[in-house]
Amino acid sequence: MKSSQTLVYSIPRNVEKDTCAAAIKAYQYLISPPPSPIPNDKVASTVDVPKCSTIPESPKDSIVEPKPTATPVAQLHSKVYDLYRDSPKIWLRRERQWLQRHSPAYRFSTPAAKRPRRQPSSFLDVHASNTRKRGSPDTPDSGHSTPHSKGDVHPGMPQHNTRFKQSSREFSSNTQAIDVANTPYELLPDYSPDMSVLDKRSHPRPLRSEWKGPPLDLSNDENRHLLHPAELQLAATLRLPCLVYLDNKRRIFAEWHNRRTQGLSFRKTDAQRASRVDVNKASRLWKAFHDEGFFDD
């Protein structure tokens, strides 16, 4: 068997110190490469030495840009609203023509012109227009029926009868009542009581009422002679001129007479609807007349 030989370098003792240093330097070349002959300060400037790292850097995500294509890409843009905004009437006419052509069930008819409303010339015309009799519940009412064309009826839609039954009390009220709120003062019948009965009252101040603010001065009113002194005090307290007071008094008692003939009670809200003043002042008038018993049967 061959014995392994070990290479041993021995330095003689009689070698000088400089020789020993040179031998040690030569010995280092056996275990490491020789140093570069270029100085270290010049190596960085002349040679691009790659830096080593124990942790490899992660690759950066590269953004891939789409390559431009030579063929153009088709794009769709809506122009319906722009066309409608430029000419809405023409667009509507075209849509109607399309509906008439594809859907014959839809027919667009022009509305008939309304006849001008005839103004009442006298109290008899007003009374006749308000007391026009309606059809009975068993017979159709020709005055309130609305004609329908065949084009207005859509296929598949149920037909409903819009005629309603009417109670006997409502029928009697419609044939006898007068629209007090919309009737001129001169055409209203005067159902006001005789105010001379106020002189026989035991209390010194009949037709009492309260209102905020100072009373209205009616000393120079040209219609003050038509009012009782108690009525003058009531009108001044409510700050109503004499003519306004007379107008609302006649309307209140006309409405009271209409409801009494129908067998109905006369409430404060009924006086408010018939009057042409503030609802609070109408309530004060109703209370003043009610306290004196003018609404008693």
Swiss-Prot record:
Protein's cellular compartments: Nucleus
Primary residence: nucleus
Domain SWIRM stretches: 207-297
InterPro entries: Homeodomain-like_sf, SWIRM, WH-like_DNA-bd_sf
MF-aspect GO terms: chromatin binding; DNA binding; transcription coactivator activity
Keyword Chloroplast found: no
GO BP: any one term: transcription initiation-coupled chromatin remodeling
Pfam families: SWIRM
Subunit: Component of the RPD3C(L) complex.
Cited PANTHER family: SWIRM DOMAIN-CONTAINING PROTEIN FUN19-RELATED, TRANSCRIPTIONAL ADAPTOR 2 ADA2 -RELATED
Function: Component of the RPD3C(L) histone deacetylase complex (HDAC) responsible for the deacetylation of lysine residues on the N-terminal part of the core histones (H2A, H2B, H3 and H4). Histone deacetylation gives a tag for epigenetic repression and plays an important role in transcriptional regulation, cell cycle progression and developmental events.
Protein name per the record: SWIRM domain-containing protein laf1
Taxonomic source organism: Schizosaccharomyces pombe (strain 972 / ATCC 24843) (Fission yeast)
Native organism taxonomy: Eukaryota, Fungi, Dikarya, Ascomycota, Taphrinomycotina
